[in-house]
């Protein structure tokens, strides 16, 4: 499942990137096993649900970097990793960080991998503070 999860993350990143660019997309994870589909849809939905909170967390824990200066791919990798840590408590945070770093190295550059690693490691080190931010999070996009 771990290789499939890596492929799921890549596909989720592709859809998040396209959505960020304002493209019309049809989210489809049918290429994956039933377990992979569940993982991919939950990760995609979580990244959208937690987007504003993730941006707040990224801003808080990315030293000397304004959110606007972070590239679109890197931002989506960070959002996805934060959503994964919130959504899948059974996946060790270190695995999530490593997967995010590998995505950054593959789709951006080795330097982007180090950048992503630094921010996510800072987030993991301050996880209690991050959980408090999550507790105060109100999803303004929900239609309740």
Curated annotation (Swiss-Prot):
Give the CC-aspect GO terms: cytosol
The job of this chain, per UniProt, is described as: Involved in transcription antitermination. Required for transcription of ribosomal RNA (rRNA) genes. Binds specifically to the boxA antiterminator sequence of the ribosomal RNA (rrn) operons.
State the species of origin: Dictyoglomus turgidum (strain DSM 6724 / Z-1310)
- Name the UniProt key words of this record, in alphabetical order: RNA-binding, Transcription, Transcription antitermination, Transcription regulation
InterPro entries cross-referenced by the UniProt entry: NusB-like_sf, NusB_fam, NusB_RsmB_TIM44
Tell me, what is an example of a GO biological process annotation in this record?
DNA-templated transcription termination
Tell me the protein family, please.
Answer: Belongs to the NusB family.
Fetch the Gene3D superfamilies from UniProt.
NusB-like
Pfam families registered for this protein in UniProt: NusB
Q: What is this protein called?
A: Transcription antitermination protein NusB
The terms under GO molecular function for this entry are: RNA binding
């Amino acid at each position: 499942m771990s290789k499939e999860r890596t492929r799921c993350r890549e596909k989720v990143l592709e859809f998040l990137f396209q959505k960020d660019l304002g493209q019309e997309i049809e989210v489809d994870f049918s290429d994956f096993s039933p377990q992979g589909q569940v993982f991919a849809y939950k990760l995609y939905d979580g990244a959208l649900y937690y987007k504003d909170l993730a941006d707040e967390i990224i801003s808080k824990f990315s030293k000397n970097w304004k959110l606007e200066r972070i590239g679109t791919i890197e931002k989506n990798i960070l959002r996805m990793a934060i959503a994964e840590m919130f959504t899948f408590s059974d996946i060790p945070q270190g695995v999530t960080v490593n997967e995010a770093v590998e995505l950054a190295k593959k789709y951006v550059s080795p330097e982007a991998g180090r950048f992503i690693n630094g921010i996510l490691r800072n987030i993991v080190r301050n996880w209690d503070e991050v959980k408090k931010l999550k507790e105060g999070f109100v999803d303004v996009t929900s239609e309740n």
